[in-house]
């Protein structure tokens, strides 16, 4: 009837006298229409009377308190009225607020509770305020007991200016004095339990300090755990400085020390901060007494790679060996990149990057430069993970060598390349790998170089040796003439090794026949190159290897994809469950092959790349870069002698290849990002992060985060330039990219924590690159393979063995009885055998003989 009233505890009597209704009720919360004794307890309460529905009598309490302060109820309400003055609310039980009456339900004595807050009686500590926000309570504290000897349950709250349930049943009613209302406490209320002493308020400050001590205890971490490991975001390591620990220097030769980069907040209550091991010092000076953070830290952020090898060495080992952990040598260096907009494949934020000894030590805003650090201002520019180009061929009949190829890579923002090693003549694959490694040691390369081996036959033992001993985790199938059964066996073996198989989508035998056909037709120029390699033939090759790869549950990658039909075959295979991935050629993103039909032979010959360029392919390639998972863009960098190629008598013998390591990232940015097809994060994924995941480099490479290798590029997206071979690092005279305008500039490329390229010049000083060993079993490729092997999609029917041998059949029927099975001798004779011999059959069966009718 009155939904805005508090729940009724009990009703003593109800009388009906004419049109008046008398109801005696007791409320859970104060109401201006409930009976309440006067402050003196002597005057009689007035019962509200309803004379009729149209005529309302204003009722007031004669014993209104002279102090003008009402006692509190226990039920808040947000309603307000201009007629009725608000009363206050208290969270104390009614029995605890009563001074003159005792509760009908006895209340146990409780120990004094702490000061009451607005949070249901539980005080919020400073640590909880840090976690959940908020400040000090604005609710008035309860008044002290008039009699200190009274139990806590007898306390009375005197503040009556808080919200109270609205009294406005009807207009014209006045508020009654609702003091000393008694209600039994709720035994299930957590706040009442605190008052009764069943559970004291927890000491959040003490628990918070103990938890932080446990987190910051270096002994609580395994050797491979890095407390400073970060997730993307601008708050990584914010305001982190190191505390001076002289005692740790004596132990740096014994074992690595682990320091946490946890920023301790100030205490809200007293404004003081704790000073513990691993925390910042009080003055916040990270270079106090000339001591740098690296001097106090042995190995920065140490992580374990997939094969269990540590990715960072101790400081003592680095000083003795001169190895910076990235393949190069040199003294320890400190670099601070300021005000950069950091772009990872999943986040964009503004922060500074502190690099020490080739490892990213801190990512946070407003970092202070340590003593002796080199500062690189990147304001207004992007900081991206350095590019990873997984298909270069500078060691295969190229005018570039490893040194020149690496310079081209860093000039384009690439910090790591995967060089494809091809055996020469009768050279074994193991010998070819060792030959290239020797070249890497002799050359002053400025970027990281990993190797991928091209195989021409199924060499099982040599492949196993390369994976286990030489740091190889991928193989390239280029023109391998294997039958399907041998190819399936090869895929099974590669899967067991945990390596990635990469397939060049070209049927060499059929292509040779088509080239001869073109030459007979008089097509000798560059235009014959794409016509001798139809898209359908390329798609058929892709479809075939994807089917075999799916049968073997082996991850495969199709390299140098340049046709829409090949992409369609890959997408179809993935829909069928194949673990197939695409490596898009940067040349196919740039040009559509129309230049091959140009009248200018020199210009047309420059477009004779490893892959035939197709008309209408660039848009399809960009679409694949924006949608397919683990798709990468490769350059296929193999510059050739332009004069020799032009002088070739036909396209079949002309050398194929072009530059691309320096132009790859700029072309993808121009064609895909600037056109709005992909964003900057996807750009990072297709040029760096996805390749790092496929070749088991992630998260050491392909990401800007604490503990990752300091390989990054400072990218100016507001710049503009025209690509020209004369200003490129490659030795090729002319390129298919000549004359292309791009709206991006590589300001600086950092490899291994050192600036290798800046403002258009390659730094010849200390190199930080070198051979990069790759571990097998990338989790981004083989995690699904293990599950597929456990739950093979095969069906097996369990059948019980037959207890007796099946009886022989005669004339299509089982022999039912006897040792004699009579064959049919007449066409109309029944094939049913009733048993017995023919001599004993009755001649006159019931119903008469049937032979007489015939």
Swiss-Prot record:
Expressed in ventral cord and nerve ring (at protein level). Isoform a: Expressed in nerve ring (at protein level). Expressed in the nervous system, two amphid socket cells and weakly in non-neuronal pharyngeal cells. Changing residue 168 to K: In yad26; in the PLM neuron axon, increases the number of unc-9 puncta close to the two original gap junctions and the length of the first gap junction, also causes mis-localization of unc-1, loss of unc-1-unc-9 co-localization and a reduction in the number of unc-9 leaving the gap junction. The keyword Membrane does not apply. Keywords: Cell projection, Neurogenesis. Residues 193-202, 279-298, 816-827 have a biased composition (Basic and acidic residues). Pfam families: Amidohydro_1. One of its GO terms (cellular component) is cytosol. GO terms for molecular function: dihydropyrimidinase activity; filamin binding; protein heterodimerization activity; protein homodimerization activity. It is found in: Cell projection, Axon; Cell projection, Dendrite. Residues 240-257 have a biased composition (Acidic residues). Gene3D superfamilies: Metal-dependent hydrolases, Urease, subunit C, domain 1. Residues 58-68, 75-97, 802-811 have a biased composition (Polar residues). InterPro entries: Amidohydro-rel, Metal-dep_hydrolase_composite, Metal_Hydrolase, Metallo-dep_Hydrolases_sf. The keyword Nucleus does not apply. GO terms for biological process: axon guidance; chemorepulsion of axon; establishment or maintenance of actin cytoskeleton polarity; establishment or maintenance of microtubule cytoskeleton polarity; motor neuron axon guidance; negative regulation of microtubule polymerization; netrin-activated signaling pathway; pyrimidine nucleobase catabolic process. Changing residue 389 to N: In e204; uncoordinated. In AIY, ASI, D-type neurons, impairs axonal guidance and outgrowth and in some cases causes ectopic axonal branching. It comes from the Eukaryota. Residues 57-114, 130-327, 794-854 are annotated as: Disordered. During neurogenesis, plays an essential role in axonal guidance and outgrowth by regulating the polarization of both microtubule and actin cytoskeletons. Establishes the asymmetry of axonal and dendrite microtubules and the polarized sorting of neuronal proteins. This is achieved in part by regulating the localization of kinesin-like protein unc-104. In neurons without a distal microtubule-organizing center (MTOC), also controls the organization of microtubules in dendrites. Belongs to the metallo-dependent hydrolases superfamily. Hydantoinase/dihydropyrimidinase family. Isoform a: Probable monomer. Isoform b: Probable homodimer. Isoform c: Probable homodimer. Probable heterodimer composed of isoform b and isoform c. Interacts with unc-14 and kinesin-1 motor complex light chain klc-1; both interactions regulate unc-33 neurite localization. Interacts with fln-1 (via calponin-homology (CH) domains and filamin repeat 18-19). Isoform c: Interacts with vab-8 isoform a. This is Protein unc-33.
């Amino acid at each position: 009837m009155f939904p805005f009233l508090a729940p009724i505890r009990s009703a003593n009597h109800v009388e009906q006298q004419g049109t008046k209704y008398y109801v005696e009720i007791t409320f859970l919360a104060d109401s201006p229409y409930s009976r309440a004794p006067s402050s003196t307890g002597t005057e009689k309460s007035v019962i509200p009377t309803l004379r009729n529905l149209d005529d309302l009598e204003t009722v007031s309490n004669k014993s209104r308190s002279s102090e003008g302060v009402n006692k509190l109820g226990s039920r808040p309400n947000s309603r307000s009225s201009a007629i009725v003055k608000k009363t206050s609310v208290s969270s104390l039980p009614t029995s605890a607020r009563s001074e003159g009456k005792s509760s009908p339900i006895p209340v146990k004595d409780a120990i004094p509770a702490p000061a009451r807050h607005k949070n249901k009686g539980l005080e919020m500590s400073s640590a909880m305020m840090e976690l959940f926000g908020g400040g000090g309570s604005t609710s008035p504290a309860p008044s002290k007991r008039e009699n200190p000897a009274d139990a806590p349950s007898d306390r009375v709250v005197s503040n009556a200016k808080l919200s109270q349930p609205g009294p406005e049943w009807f207009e014209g009613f006045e508020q009654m004095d609702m003091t000393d209302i008694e209600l039994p406490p709720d035994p299930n209320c957590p706040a009442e339990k605190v008052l009764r002493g069943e559970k004291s308020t927890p000491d959040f400050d003490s628990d918070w300090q103990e938890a932080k001590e446990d987190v910051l205890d270096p002994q609580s971490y395994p050797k491979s755990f890095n407390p400073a490991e970060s997730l993307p975001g601008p708050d990584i390591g914010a305001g982190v400085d190191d505390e001076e620990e002289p005692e740790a220097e004596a132990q740096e030769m014994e074992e690595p020390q682990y320091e946490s980069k946890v920023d301790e907040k100030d205490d809200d209550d007293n404004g003081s901060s704790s000073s513990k091991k691993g925390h910042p010092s009080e003055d916040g000076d990270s270079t106090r007494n000339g001591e740098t953070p690296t001097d106090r830290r042995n190995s920065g952020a140490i992580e374990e790679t997939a094969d269990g090898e540590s990715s960072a060495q101790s400081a003592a080992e680095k000083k003795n060996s001169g190895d910076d952990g990235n393949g190069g040598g040199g003294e320890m260096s400190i670099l601070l990149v300021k005000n950069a907009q950091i772009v990872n494949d999943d986040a964009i934020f503004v922060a500074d990057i502190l690099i020490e000894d080739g490892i990213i030590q801190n990512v946070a805003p407003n970092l202070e430069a340590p003593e002796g650090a080199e500062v690189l201002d990147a304001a207004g520019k992007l900081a991206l993970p350095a590019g990873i180009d997984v298909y270069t061929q500078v060691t295969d009949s190229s005018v570039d060598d490893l040194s020149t190829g690496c310079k081209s890579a860093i000039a384009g923002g690439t910090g790591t390349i995967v060089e494809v090693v091809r055996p020469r003549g009768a050279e074994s694959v193991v010998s070819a790998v060792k030959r290239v490694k020797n070249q890497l040691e002799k050359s002053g390369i400025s970027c990281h170089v990993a190797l991928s081996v091209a195989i021409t036959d199924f060499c099982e033992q040599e492949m196993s040796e390369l994976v286990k001993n030489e740091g190889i985790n991928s193989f390239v199938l280029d023109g391998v003439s294997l039958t399907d059964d041998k190819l399936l066996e090869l895929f099974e073996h590669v899967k067991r090794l945990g390596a990635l198989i990469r397939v060049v989508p070209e049927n060499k035998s059929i292509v040779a026949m088509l080239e001869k056909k073109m030459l007979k037709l008089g097509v000798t120029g560059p235009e014959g190159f794409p016509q001798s390699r139809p898209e359908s033939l390329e798609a058929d090759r892709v479809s075939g290897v994807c089917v075999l790869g799916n049968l073997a549950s082996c991850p495969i990658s199709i390299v140098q994809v340049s046709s829409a039909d090949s992409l369609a075959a890959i997408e179809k295979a993935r829909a069928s469950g194949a673990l197939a991935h695409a490596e898009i050629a940067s040349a196919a993103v740039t040009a559509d092959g129309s230049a091959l039909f140009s009248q200018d032979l020199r210009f047309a010959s420059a477009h004779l790349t490893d892959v035939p360029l197709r008309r209408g392919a660039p848009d399809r390639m960009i679409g694949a870069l924006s949608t397919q998972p683990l798709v990468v863009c490769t350059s296929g960098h193999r510059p050739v002698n332009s004069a020799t190629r032009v002088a070739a008598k036909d396209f079949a013998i002309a050398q194929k290849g072009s530059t691309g390591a320096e132009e790859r990232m700029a072309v993808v940015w121009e064609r895909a990002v600037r056109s709005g097809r992909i964003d900057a994060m996807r750009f990072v994924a297709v040029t760096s992060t996805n390749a790092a995941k496929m070749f088991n480099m992630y998260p050491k490479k392909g990401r800007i985060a604490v503990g990752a290798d300091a390989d990054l590029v400072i990218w100016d997206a507001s710049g503009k330039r025209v690509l020209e071979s004369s200003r490129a690092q490659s030795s090729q005279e002319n390129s298919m990219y000549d004359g292309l305008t791009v709206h991006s500039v590589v300001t600086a490329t950092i490899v291994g924590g050192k600036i290798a390229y800046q403002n258009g010049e390659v730094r010849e000083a200390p190199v930080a690159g070198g051979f990069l060993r790759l571990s097998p079993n990338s989790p981004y490729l083989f995690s699904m393979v293990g599950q597929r092997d456990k739950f093979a999609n095969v069906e097996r029917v369990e059948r019980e063995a037959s207890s007796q041998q099946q009886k022989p059949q005669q004339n299509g029927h089982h022999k039912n009885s006897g040792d004699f099975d009579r064959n049919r001798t007449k066409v109309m004779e029944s094939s049913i055998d009733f048993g017995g011999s023919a001599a004993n059959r009755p001649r006159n069966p019931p119903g008469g003989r049937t032979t007489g009718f015939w």
